[in-house]
Amino acid sequence: MHLQTRAAVVTGAASGIGLALSARFARAGAGVVMADVDGDALHRRAAELTARGAQVTAVTADLTDPEVVERLADTAFDQLGDIDVVCNNAGVLGPVGQPLWEVPLERMRQVFEVNHWAHVLVARAFVPRLLERGRPAHLIHTASMSAFVVGAGSAAYAASKHADLAVARSLRADLRGTGVRVSVLCPGRVDTPMVQGLTAPRGAGGDTSVSAEDVAGLVWEALGSDRFYLFSNSDARIRLRDQFDDVWRHVSLPPPSPEEELWPAPKATTVTMNH
């Protein structure tokens, strides 16, 4: 059943997928809190949506700062009341085309702080509040096809997206049985300002391209469902098949030894508490 979306929070909302998500929610009549570190661009885009009748609030926020993220959560719940959707979407591309040993450590750290650490902070700030309210909600993590398929010269970005995929999978397990669903958005190439003028890293594959609006539509249709992986590009199946076929070809484990087959299971331990 599609989640009734009356209120949404979108990070990385000043451009690209984040802006398209904000516009999609606003068009459906939802109130939207838009957050981004680029305050000037964010307020321009929010003003454009407001001029079209949208109910949006723009919050300039450095999402790598735990205190800032906590204030964002407070502001969002104060403005919107109950929140139905949180799109954990902030991201940067970082250095592309450089081998790992040539990427400045500070640049790699910056990519991880935005693509991974900021997503952790947003989840830690919003999920407890969502659980406390006890209403259905949906957390969308924006990862990437680079969480699965890695090419040359993409160490910082791909590693950060692998980490974010792991966080999303862990959150899904942690929240199973609650009313908060989790999905991970894994777009391939999307026509956004972040990738204009770039070519795909060698070995990453992926020739198809979609619009940010296409991606926002995919997310909209998935709200309230149990779909975890959201793939936006038509070549995703081929790219994933090639990736995992390669893994499977290298799985050549020997049969277990008799000792391994008979290895005893751990014994239960009883602890007596003295009061």
Curated annotation (Swiss-Prot):
It is an enzyme of class 1 (oxidoreductase). The keyword Oxidoreductase applies. Keywords: Antibiotic biosynthesis, NAD, Oxidoreductase. NAD(+) binds at residues 12-36, 161. GO terms for molecular function: oxidoreductase activity. InterPro entries: HdxpentlteDhPtlF (IPR054968), NAD(P)-bd_dom_sf (IPR036291), Sc_DH/Rdtase_CS (IPR020904), SDR_fam (IPR002347). Substrate binds at residue 144. GO terms for biological process: antibiotic biosynthetic process. It catalyses: 1-deoxy-11beta-hydroxypentalenate + NAD(+) = 1-deoxy-11-oxopentalenate + NADH + H(+). Pfam families: adh_short (PF00106). Pathway: Antibiotic biosynthesis; pentalenolactone biosynthesis. Its EC number is 1.1.1.340. The active site is at residue 157. Catalyzes the oxidation of 1-deoxy-11-beta-hydroxypentalenic acid to 1-deoxy-11-oxopentalenic acid in the biosynthesis of pentalenolactone antibiotic. Belongs to the short-chain dehydrogenases/reductases (SDR) family. NCBIfam families: HdxpentlteDhPtlF. This is 1-deoxy-11-beta-hydroxypentalenate dehydrogenase. It comes from Streptomyces exfoliatus. The gene is penF.
